[in-house]
Amino acid sequence: MNSKAQQAKQSLGIFKEKVDLVLGEILDKEIKEAENYTQLAVDYMTELKNISLVSGKRLRPSFVYYTYKLSGGRNEEEIIKIAAAIELVHVFLLVEDDFMDIASKRRGYPTINETYRLWHAKNLYKKDSTHFGNTIAVNVGLICDHIALNVLNNSNFDLELIKKAVNQLNNQIIIKKVKFR
């Protein structure tokens, strides 16, 4: 590997660490909030944090970050939060994709739907464990998306720019969902 490629890989690794730190902070705050509700809420928010931080290259957030920086942007702290929000949207789409594909593994780890299907079956509940796991997965995915939108809406960037970005993001999600792949 040449030195420029090594440099790029190293820069991406440093960036990933920054995004993961912010992702962890965002999700820790949500886990703390979930403590006001049920243990199950805490558990699935913790599971959301775990799947958000496991592997992944953080390419989508890096595109946001480096586009901003190359365009002259200087607010490092805020753009890292925005990049983390974009990763959360990606996680939301992966959780939904796992549900739609009836997947049991993602990146070598159990999916949300599989984790909670197994939890339900282990606890000997009488109703359908697959349905329970899928229900939790859909809810966790939607929560993830809304956390991302909260991060975007609460950023210190110009509200009109945020509005445009959220609309563009939503349009991309709609297009992806309407195509059904």
Predicted regions located by residue number:
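Short amphipathic alpha-helical interaction/hinge segments
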Residues: 93, 100, 177-181
